[in-house]
A protein has these predicted regions:
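Acyl-thioester-processing domains in fatty-acid/polyketide/NRPS systems
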Residues: 37, 49, 180-198, 472-738
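NAD(P)H/NAD(P)+-dependent Rossmann-fold oxidoreductase cores
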Residues: 6-129, 179, 183-407, 462-479, ...
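Short acidic (Asp/Glu) and glycine-rich catalytic loops that position anionic groups and cofactors
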Residues: 164-168, 258-259, 267, 294-297, ...
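Hydrophobic pocket-lining residues within nucleotide cofactor-binding pockets
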Residues: 173, 214, 334, 452, ...
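Glycine- and acidic
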Residues: 25, 95-101, 134-141, 168-171, ...
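Flexible, glycine-rich beta-alpha linker
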Residues: 136-143, 147-186, 264-268, 365-366, ...
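Secondary-structure transition/capping motifs at alpha-helix termini
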Residues: 80-81, 119-126, 159-166, 251-255, ...
């Protein structure tokens, strides 16, 4: 299948619907008690039992790993109590642009080992929420400072990937929210039925956000002209994946590349001369035996790796020279800030200011969350983040044109066994957003790579990935994407590029079940409907009711998308008048399932206190299919103004302003009419419960409007849509004109 290529784009989403959770116990972990009383009051009013734990009560310094902390938690918490939820209230930090928020590192470390330590206290189907206070825009705010706390989103995703039945979610709440509102928003997120959503933000305007992976078919056509005055500083660039990317870059732009690596480029030992890699072990053992010495397995591996690393570095250097580039290899430890500056300074004096940074260094220390240690975190996170911070300090940012960072799909998606690696790579993404905002003259790209073919992915692992539905990046294609993205003149949708699909693989089979959720619909939150009035009363358009039911259906079935719907009926239209209660229920009943699809029946209903039976408003049958996302491209928007189509003036259509989307019809053969449609971009504050809805309700409404026009033409009578027999979804929208 075609390699998925997508950009992380901040997208508005509606407030969460609410499911009815079983009452239980919740543990709130806090560094200060500022919001604690409001949380306790709200939760206890719902019947929950709240326990609290101050982070200050934990002696963090005595713990080397999650297992050690687990023992202290067991001594602090009562008996063998299980919690249905854990809420980690992350300490609020003030980000530092100079230090790239190094102050926040220790609390990420604490959150990591706490998560592993609390596992045995969390109900298998419970939730763990990580709540931070920032801009509410998940780190992409123009005004917010960098906070690495945002990378807790990767921890939340990894929790869910490892503890399959447990839900993990990161919540970024605007720092100015009062405690009552703070508690209310956390409550809403705890009760959100959409368990595939692991990362949300609420800004100061109470708009909710998430990162959407907007897929694109790669089209990098306009290339910058190569010029040899570029000087690139590259970490991890002489070996592996980074080396492949560098060679692709040098092929288009033969520049100067300063390659930083830990390996010392010594002359190859005599015993390894002209020996193939596969025969090195045998040659080394022969050398040791001839000397009458003994070799440990550790020494053997060390010597072989050293020879192989030197060979790979020399191959990279030779290939760069063949491409007319100027490679300079420097042995350096990017974790050593003091030594790094002294190493780089003379190179800058000789070759000129560094104009591009490529940060590809990284290490792994895979193990389960409950086995994670401080040492693991410091090694994995330190190499990625402290290494980047140290590199940044030796550079003159005003001279930079490019910052290209190697991140991982583990950060964007989460990945079992890689919680620290996921956090580090999501921190890279956050730094990319920060640099993108604060250094607009620099092209910043954070490449969230999936697994690459070759290297750590051997044939057996490749087969495993294929069975799980995980795309493996072909070496040539990945390197080409790197180079073309770096050198193209295309306007990038965001600084975070995701290459490959979800590395967690296919979702587990879902057991069909009936479900019920509540939703609040207020005209004040959806003022668009004042432009859809009958008899002076705003009415919920049938197309929007259908889109609401379809989106709710997808929320409950992770990895499934609506394939089609049938038998949609308007039973009693929803009028926004004084009689409306604002509180509604969306109820689902299971119909059938096959290997690839699930069919359910969904209805929107309201209940008046004086009546025992709920009032039925809309009903539809939905077929969901296990489906991979499709490339969309950005929607091509066209200038818009309300249509002057005569049907809006002569009483055929009652729609106003944003609903005036049809234009002149032209009659064609056999009595068929065609219409032009131009869709506006409706402001998000006018359509809060439908913002970001993928089912194009306004386009569907345009289709229903066209039917009303045709009905008037045939019968000379006005009409309203009361049912739709069926509909299928083939592809996402690509334009605002049809």
């Amino acid at each position: 299948s075609q390699l998925e290529l997508g950009w992380a784009v901040l997208t508005p989403i509606p407030p969460p619907h609410q499911i009815f959770r079983q009452v239980g116990s919740v543990l709130v972990v806090h560094n200060d008690a500022h919001h604690l009383s409001a949380i306790k009051e709200l939760w206890e009013s719902k019947g929950f039992k709240i326990d609290s734990l101050s982070m200050k009560k934990i002696d963090w310094h005595q713990h080397e790993d999650a297992m050690s902390l687990k023992e202290e938690l067991n001594s602090i918490l009562e008996g063998n109590q299980l919690f249905q939820g854990v809420i980690w209230l992350h300490p609020m930090m003030i980000g530092s642009k100079e230090e790239l928020d190094s102050d926040g590192d220790i609390w990420l470390q604490h959150a990591l080992i706490f998560s592993g330590a609390i596992k045995n206290r969390l109900d298998t189907e419970g939730s763990i929420l990580y709540v931070a206070q920032g801009s509410g825009n998940l780190g992409s705010s123009e005004n917010g400072s960098l906070q690495v706390a945002q990378s807790l989103s990767a921890l939340a995703k990894t929790v869910q990937a490892e503890w399959v039945a447990t839900h993990g979610r990161f919540i970024d709440l605007h720092k100015d929210f009062e405690s009552v509102k703070f508690a209310e928003l956390v409550w809403q997120e705890l009760n959100d039925p959409n368990l595939s959503r692991n990362q949300v933000g609420w800004d100061q305007n109470l708009q909710r956000w998430e990162y959407e992976r907007v897929l694109h078919i790669p089209q990098f056509t306009q290339q910058e002209l190569p010029f040899s005055s570029r000087v690139w500083l590259v970490s991890g660039g002489a070996k592996g994946v980074t080396s492949a990317c560098l060679l692709a870059l040098a092929k288009q732009s033969p520049d100067t590349f300063i390659l930083l690596g830990r390996t010392a480029l010594a002359e190859e030992p005599a015993w390894a001369s002209e020996v193939y890699d596969k025969d090195l072990k045998e040659a080394f053992l022969k050398e040791i035996t001839n000397k009458g010495e003994k070799a440990t397995p550790k020494l053997i591996n060390q010597m072989i790796k050293q020879v192989q690393a030197s060979r790979e570095i020399n191959r990279t250097i030779q290939k760069l020279k063949e491409l007319r580039a100027t490679p300079i290899y420097v042995q350096a430890n990017i974790s050593d800030q003091s030594g790094l500056g002294g190493t780089i300074k003379p190179i800058i004096e000789q070759h000129g200011e560094i104009t591009g940074l490529i940060h590809g260094a990284g290490v792994l220390a895979d193990r389960k969350l409950e086995q994670k240690s401080i040492k693991d975190f410091d090694l994995v996170y330190g190499t990625k983040i402290n290494g980047l911070r140290n590199l940044w300090k030796v550079l003159d940012s005003s001279k930079l044109s490019h910052v290209l960072l190697f991140s991982s799909g583990a950060g964007f998606f989460g990945n079992p066994g890689q919680s620290d690696y996921a956090i580090a790579n999501e921190a890279i993404n956050q730094i990319a957003w920060d640099l993108h905002k604060n250094h607009p003259h620099v092209k910043v790209v954070s490449y969230n790579w999936g697994p690459w073919d070759g290297g750590m992915v051997d044939e057996n692992l490749k087969k495993l990935f294929q069975q799980r539905g995980v795309q493996v990046i072909p070496r040539g294609e990945g390197a080409k994407i790197f180079a073309e993205t770096a050198l193209s003149n295309n306007q990038l949708p965001s600084p975070v590029l995701v290459v490959g699909n979800d590395i967690r693989g296919k979702d587990l089979p879902i057991s069909p079940k009936n479900w019920e959720e509540s939703i609040t619909l207020k005209l004040v939150d959806n003022t668009l409907f004042t432009e859809h009035s009958i008899g002076g009363v705003p009415v919920l358009p049938a197309a929007y009711a259908l889109a609401l039911l379809l989106r709710s259906s997808e929320d409950h079935y992770q990895g499934y998308k609506v394939q089609k719907f049938q038998n949609f009926k308007v039973l009693q239209g929803l009028r926004f008048d004084e009689q409306i209660s604002n509180c509604f229920t969306i109820k689902s009943s299971f119909v059938s399932e096959s290997n690839e699809t699930i069919q359910i029946s969904v209805a929107l209903q309201s209940s008046e206190k004086k009546k025992s039976l709920p009032k039925q408003h809309y009903h539809v049958e939905v077929v969901l299919a296990a489906s991979a996302p499709q490339p969309t491209g950005q929607i091509v928007a066209h200038p818009w103004e309300p249509s002057l189509f005569e049907a809006y003036e002569n009483g055929t259509l009652f729609h106003e302003n944003y609903f005036k989307v049809l234009s002149t019809s032209s009659n064609v053969k056999n009595g068929i009419s065609s219409f032009d449609v131009n869709l506006p971009e409706v402001p998000i504050e006018k359509i809060k419960n439908w913002v970001g809805n993928q089912f194009a309700p306004l386009l569907l409404d345009a289709g229903l409007q066209a039917m009303l026009v045709k009905g008037r033409e045939l019968t000379k009578l006005p009409s309203l849509p009361l049912s739709i027999d069926s509909g299928s979804f083939l592809a996402p929208l690509r334009s605002s004109k049809y």
